[in-house]
């Protein structure tokens, strides 16, 4: 039996740490060549022995055997797909009907939500919400699809009284970053965590004494190393994709949770502002 199938079949029996390992392996199967058990343990906040025991539970002698088998399964799957049809997005091919495409997209998004939520450290999330709530000024940075997620969050935070900026222009993002002060917060959204523009802004913000919060993947990256706090997102999208669909879904689940957490922290005043905002926009109709 294929290891990916074994992981899926045994999921109901996994402990908390085992579920973290399973989620990581499935989300990063295309990048496992560069992942060691030591690096993985550090990113997940668990011991290396937990990873070895997980591999043995699935029938492998150790993590190396499991990793190589998963790489082989992924490569074989790619070759099979490429031989029969054009690869349109993630697991979707040109041979798929619209019904099949809909099912695949829905499942991809469901997995992104399930796996991202499974990784939440709620004590750390509460701390991040408190840090944001006390910030005199908040800058949100992102590129492409991540910028859209950031813009949505900025609108939500403005609605409940926060001073926020989320500029699309990277030069403006950099300019704002260097003007941040101690106590200010920069929320950097980047799934790869390696975009030069976002990393540059995070470096500038940190240098100025601002708190950097990264919404990024589990993969080790320059942004992850720079951030004071990280909020992990998981996406089942393969290296080849036509658009960041499930990635945006995962990122939105994090930003929506931040927003609701901030509303809850100051519920009476926040709800008053939301109601006033609704009343004003109704008058524009």
From Swiss-Prot:
DNA-binding region positions on the chain? 37-56
Per the record, the GO terms for biological process are:
carbohydrate derivative metabolic process; N-acetylmuramic acid catabolic process; negative regulation of DNA-templated transcription; regulation of carbohydrate catabolic process
Extract one GO molecular function annotation from the record: carbohydrate derivative binding
Pfam entry (one): SIS
Identify the InterPro entries for this entry: Homeodomain-like_sf (IPR009057), HTH_RpiR (IPR000281), RpiR-like (IPR047640), RpiR-like_SIS (IPR035472), SIS_dom (IPR001347), SIS_dom_sf (IPR046348), Tscrpt_reg_HTH_MurR (IPR022821), WH-like_DNA-bd_sf (IPR036388)
Domain HTH rpiR-type positions: 1-77
Q: Which UniProt keywords apply?
A: Carbohydrate metabolism, DNA-binding, Repressor, Transcription, Transcription regulation
Q: Which CDD domains match?
A: SIS_RpiR (cd05013)
Domain SIS span(s) in chain numbering: 128-268
**Which pathway does this polypeptide act in?**
Amino-sugar metabolism; N-acetylmuramate degradation [regulation]
Say what the protein does.
Represses the expression of the murPQ operon involved in the uptake and degradation of N-acetylmuramic acid (MurNAc). Binds to two adjacent inverted repeats within the operator region. MurNAc 6-phosphate, the substrate of MurQ, is the specific inducer that weakens binding of MurR to the operator.
Assembly notes: Homotetramer.
Give the protein name, as stated in the record: HTH-type transcriptional regulator MurR
What gene is this protein a product of? murR
């Amino acid at each position: 039996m294929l290891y990916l199938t074994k992981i899926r079949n045994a999921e109901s029996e996994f402990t908390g740490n085992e579920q973290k390992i399973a989620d990581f392996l499935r989300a990063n199967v295309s990048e496992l060549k560069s992942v060691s058990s030591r690096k993985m343990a550090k990113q997940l906040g668990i011991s290396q022995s937990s990873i070895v025991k997980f591999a043995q539970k699935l029938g492998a002698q150790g993590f190396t055997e499991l990793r190589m088998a998963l790489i082989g399964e992924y490569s074989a799957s790619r070759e099979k797909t490429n031989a029969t049809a054009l690869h349109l997005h993630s697991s979707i091919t040109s041979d798929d009907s619209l019904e099949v495409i809909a099912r695949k997209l829905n499942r991809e998004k469901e997995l992104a939500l399930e796996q991202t939520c499974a990784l939440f450290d709620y004590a750390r999330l509460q701390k991040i919400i408190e840090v944001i709530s006390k910030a005199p000024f908040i800058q949100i940075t992102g590129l492409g699809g991540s910028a859209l997620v950031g813009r949505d969050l900025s609108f939500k935070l403005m609605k409940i009284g926060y001073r926020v900026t989320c500029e699309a222009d990277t030069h403006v993002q950099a300019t704002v970053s260097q003007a941040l002060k101690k106590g200010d917060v920069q929320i950097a959204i980047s799934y790869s965590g390696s975009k030069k523009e976002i990393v540059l802004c995070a470096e500038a913000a940190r240098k100025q004494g601002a708190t950097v919060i990264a919404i990024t993947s589990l993969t080790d990256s320059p942004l992850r190393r720079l951030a004071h706090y990280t909020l992990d997102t998981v996406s089942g999208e393969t290296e080849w994709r036509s658009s960041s669909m499930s990635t945006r879904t995962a990122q939105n689940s994090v930003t929506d949770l931040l927003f609701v957490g901030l509303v809850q922290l100051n519920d009476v005043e926040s709800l008053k502002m939301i109601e006033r905002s609704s009343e004003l926009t109704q008058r524009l109709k």
